[in-house]
From Swiss-Prot:
It comes from Snake adenovirus serotype 1. Structural component of the virion that presumably stabilizes the groups of hexons but is dispensable for assembly. The lineage of its organism: Viruses, Varidnaviria, Bamfordvirae, Preplasmiviricota, Tectiliviricetes. It comes from the Viruses. InterPro entries: Pectin_lyas_fold, Pectin_lyase_fold/virulence. This is Hexon-interlacing protein LH3. Keywords: Virion.
Length: 373
């Protein structure tokens, strides 16, 4: 079925030929439930998992290039550690591809327990110095970040783009955090992913990511960046944020539209989340264009003072009370523009000058007490 030499494909890699069938003879590289995943990943360049099977994995370590095709199988672990730990090489990134796996972190989300250092270990995938493609996977009920991408050291030379992380067509449900990228994990792509009932979708540290075409419904926060974050990793909060955040949907990502608390415990303080939350005077915001905010609030507390921020070409819809408020710190409000957006009167825009909202949309007001960190 396949022929792979040093990960250079000389014949097309076909997935399991009949997703509902258990075939004999099995495709080369098939990993059966109960067999050692460490041995299979070390021995094969392409590994097939059995359609519909369940695999109970605990801290499986990958140290070489491998492509894993899940065919809707389930990887499950109720212990506080990553299910798969990928240990790459910063200077010579290795290609790892994970496709069509379902990862289950627990029976249900534990929304009322404050986040802590212990919970950060409850992950599906912990990837150090990765060059990884994750496609078509599902992640359910993880107490920490379902996917954590980390750099082993700060990148200051020409290695920024070597990781080339791509996360596409995945589902996240009931997770504390969906995707966390640490410092110096840059130039990644997260596209066409669907988040539901998560507290935070993107825990953003490393910069220059493109996040496009993602949907967050009934999540408390789609985009979080501040200082002193969880999952900063060995590289710290270096060269953070910016990049692009375009054509995404924030649906009921506000204080009343989901089951997660607004309060979020960071290592040194508690913050009050928003659908889009940014608080770092040393960082630039991402390009923000074409996003749909249907009852999705926004807090812009701090950003680099010599920069501006434009909410461009979006759909801004709010409701009664404070549902779906866009609030900007007074000191920075003149640097924020709302250009070419549609919306309704229920959308409140706080502290942005009227001259910066073209055409007029929503209901503008001034309030020096907003946004509250």
């Amino acid at each position: 079925m396949t022929s792979v030499e040093d990960l250079y494909v000389v014949k097309p890699i076909n997935q399991w030929p009949a997703p509902s069938a258990f075939l004999y003879p099995l495709p080369r590289g098939t990993l059966l439930p109960g067999q050692s995943p460490d041995e299979a990943f070390a021995r094969n360049s392409v590994v097939f998992l059995v359609p519909g099977a369940e695999y109970n994995w605990k801290n499986v370590v990958i140290r070489k290039p491998v492509w894993i095709y899940g065919e809707r199988c389930h990887g499950e672990d109720f212990r506080p550690r990553a299910i798969i730990h990928i240990m790459g090489d910063l200077d010579n990134p290795m290609d790892v591809r994970i496709q069509d796996l379902t990862f289950i972190g627990g029976d249900s989300p534990d929304r009322l327990v404050p986040f802590s250092a212990v919970l950060t270990n409850q992950m599906a995938l912990w990837c150090i110095d990765p060059r990884i493609t994750i496609r078509g996977c599902s992640f359910y009920n993880f107490g920490g970040a379902a996917i954590y991408l980390e750099r082993s050291e700060r990148d200051t030379g020409f290695r920024f783009g070597r990781g080339q992380v791509m996360i596409t067509d995945c589902r996240f449900r009931g997770c504390r955090i969906g995707i966390a990228n640490g410092g110096s994990v840059e130039y990644g792509l997260a596209s066409q992913n669907n988040f539901s009932d998560c507290q935070i979708c993107f825990n953003v540290v490393g910069g220059n990511w493109t996040r496009s075409g993602n949907v967050a419904s009934n999540c408390r926060c789609m985009y979080l960046h501040t200082q002193g974050m969880w999952y900063e990793g060995a590289a710290g909060n270096f060269n953070p944020a910016h990049g692009s955040f375009t054509s995404n949907t924030l649906n009921h990502c506000d204080y009343g539209g989901n089951l997660w608390p607004t309060e979020f415990q960071l290592p040194d303080r508690v913050i009050n989340l928003a659908g889009f939350y940014f608080d770092n005077a040393a960082a630039r915001l991402p390009n923000f264009s074409g996003n749909s905010q249907w009852y999705g609030d926004m807090k812009l507390i701090n950003f680099l003072p010599d920069s501006t921020f434009v909410i461009n070409g979006g759909a801004l819809y709010g409701g009664p009370g404070d549902t779906g408020v866009i609030a900007v710190a007074t000191a920075l409000a003149a640097k924020v523009f709302v250009i070419g957006c549609q919306g309704n009167a229920g959308q409140q825009i706080v502290n942005v000058p009227a001259a910066n909202i073209i055409p007029e949309v929503g209901t503008r007001k001034d309030d020096a007490t907003q946004p509250a960190a």
